Amino acid sequence: MKDTTVPLTLISLLADGEFHSGEQLGERLGMSRAAINKHIQTLRDWGVDVFTVPGKGYSLPEPIQLLDADRIHSQLDSGNVAVLPVIDSTNQYLLDRIGELRSGDACVAEYQQAGRGRRGRKWFSPFGANLYLSMYWRLEQGPAAAIGLSLVIGIVMAEVLRKLGADKVRVKWPNDLYLLDRKLAGILVELTGKTGDAAQIVIGAGINMAMRRVEEDVINQGWITLQEAGITLDRNMLAAKLIYKLRAALELFEQEGLSPYLSRWKKLDNFIDRPVKLIIGDKEIFGISRGIDTQGALLLEQDGVIKPWMGGEISLRSAE
């Protein structure tokens, strides 16, 4: 990965939303205006909108709040949280270090160069706009005990966001958060471990907070940001609250499985009792969503018969 020191220093100087001349920035960083312009282009490549106004210099459309390790740690009583300005993927960062991690260790990033979603899809991750968070957990009972884990993560994230004012956030089976029927956040659970061994789990989450411009071919479904819904949250506070609540939820999940979460899912289910379609490969199955069963499988009603559906290749969409 190329050195990102200069662009990161630039973004910290521009974060106040004021104009800064190329000359001033060059003096601060000990380089020419032409060199500054080159690094500004790197910021644009990261998805940052930088305005250039002749005679005034460079500015961001509005101030941005950068992630701060000290502020996050000050709200937690234990565990490690790495703050990574630029990374390929937060999940990959933890997967690469799995031998040195303790349950509950986490990382957050400003920008993911290769963020990924379910089924290997690319996850669009512009700099400083959203919250990208991953956490490690060792599940002693093994991989089979992880069934339903993405549902638990979704419930906890939705409950945290609702308490902070985003009270219309809901969950979508098996791994998304929805707001006003559009995707607000995605969850990716990756695990390694053989039957009989402990499961090494990395949980990743991306929450759309204030996404700026986006190419339509990058995101293949309707999406929304908290900002668009009129909700502004402190990213450092949100990261700390999510990490705290997820650690507690994973301990409970280890002891009691999915059962403490079933009624909580029902209250938050975006598609309960609504017409939906399941996409399995190139096949579409239509029915009425009736929630989840005790294993976390989706319950789909067709012609008065309710059947559970489970599997990594199933997508759920509204059929309304």
Swiss-Prot record:
DNA-binding annotation, residue ranges on this chain: 22-41
Domain BPL/LPL catalytic: 66-254
EC number: 6.3.4.15
Alphabetized InterPro entries for the sequence: aa-tRNA-synth_II/BPL/LPL, Bifunct_BirA, Biotin_CoA_COase_ligase, Biotin_operon_repress_HTH, BPL_C, BPL_LPL_catalytic, HTH_11, Transcriptional_repressor_C
Source domain of life: Bacteria
Reactions it catalyzes: biotin + L-lysyl-[protein] + ATP = N(6)-biotinyl-L-lysyl-[protein] + AMP + diphosphate + H(+)
Assigned GO CC terms: cytoplasm
Keywords: ATP-binding, Biotin, DNA-binding, Ligase, Nucleotide-binding, Repressor, Transcription, Transcription regulation
Record flagged with keyword DNA-binding: yes
Keyword Transcription regulation: yes
An MF annotation (GO) of this entry: DNA binding
Biological-process GO terms, alphabetical: protein modification process; regulation of DNA-templated transcription
Pfam families: BPL_C (PF02237), BPL_LplA_LipB (PF03099), HTH_11 (PF08279)
Binding site for biotin: 89-91, 112, 116-118, 183
CDD domains linked: BPL
Annotated family: Belongs to the biotin--protein ligase family.
Stated role: Acts both as a biotin--[acetyl-CoA-carboxylase] ligase and a biotin-operon repressor. In the presence of ATP, BirA activates biotin to form the BirA-biotinyl-5'-adenylate (BirA-bio-5'-AMP or holoBirA) complex. HoloBirA can either transfer the biotinyl moiety to the biotin carboxyl carrier protein (BCCP) subunit of acetyl-CoA carboxylase, or bind to the biotin operator site and inhibit transcription of the operon.
Protein name in the entry: Bifunctional ligase/repressor BirA
